[in-house]
Amino acid sequence: MSRRALPSPLYAILDPGQSKGRPAIRILADLLNGGAKLLQLRAKEMTSNEFYRLAIEARELTRQAGCLLIINDRVDIAMASQADGVHLGQEDLPLETARRLMGRTRLIGISTHDLRQAQDAAGADADYIGFGPIFGTSTKETGYSPRGTATLKEIRKAVKIPIVAIGGITEDNVTQVWDAGADAAAIISDIMKAEDVAEKVRRILALR
């Protein structure tokens, strides 16, 4: 079971659907200029072809910046773009199948929402788990109520692999999830809505 440490306390998520009309590549450049070293590319509203082309561009820029690139949901696009890994939800391709396809050099993360899911993912050889939602979130409907930092602390005690906390996390509350044991905090809306994305990333990283 992998114990590979995550390279950054910030797990930035780039979602073109929240870009406020700005080109996704421009936002990516701003994220990297701000110091992002761990990035997930999520593009649920794009066609497969559009997502693939964006992933190829993102791979080149993230490689130059020394930033890990994780593709949301799509093992095929992660492999085709030579991304560093994939993040899977509970209803996506089974972890063991993704591992067989992607091998052990690429990261595989799993979304979890309770203790059993977290333990199952850790036992099934995930490289890290996403856990949440920690706080209320408007980004996407999870079907789960906010878990809070107390539950996050319980998860931290129960699993040894890295934890990425997600759900309603902002610059204002990010230290709460770090203090509760998260190795990294996934932030979407607070970054995507920022007028100055690079400066937002710098401020968040400065808190750690």
Regions found by a protein language model. Name each.
Residues 139-141:
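Glycine/threonine-rich flexible loop motifs
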Residues 82, 133-135:
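Active-site beta->alpha loop and helix N-cap motifs at the rims of alpha/beta catalytic domains
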Residues 1-93, 100-128, 144, 150, ...:
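Conserved N-terminal beta1-alpha1 strand-loop-helix module at the mouth
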Residues 180, 184:
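C-terminal binding/interaction regions
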Residues 135-137, 148:
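Short, local alpha-helical segments
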Residues 86, 185-186:
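Paired acidic/hydrophobic, glycine-rich loop segments that form the ligand-binding mouth/hinge
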